[in-house]
Amino acid sequence: PIYYTTQEIDDGTWLIDGGIVANNPSLIGYSEARKIFPGCKIKVLSIGTGINRRKINGRNSAKWGALNWFRHDILGVMLESSMFDEIARDLMAKDYLRINSSTGLVNRRMDDTSDANLKRIHLMGMEWWSEFGQDAIDFLNV
């Protein structure tokens, strides 16, 4: 419902965008890997899609009701929560690395494939590599 429409699959089951339930699917992946590879060391490199720093004015929001919270994208704020990241860090400790940073000037719309936005995405990737590249290499060096 956030980006992808609800879809019916062959057995008649209806599915919604997985980002609604697991915007950071690290915990689900870790749980499934433990089932498939019991007793094995499992490392998770979690690469985010960028943090879009949303600002909510405290003074104004104190007067909002439910409708105003939805108008100000409370779902987007909730989906960017670091709660899943914190739980993953607690469970996996040194076997978990999360890479995520500001999106900068990148347009967050998933369907913006303009040359200008693709250049911004490329620049963001290069900045992320400068910031996180060595950490990722060190982490994956098993």
What are these regions (language model features)?
Residues 1-142:
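Patatin-like phospholipase
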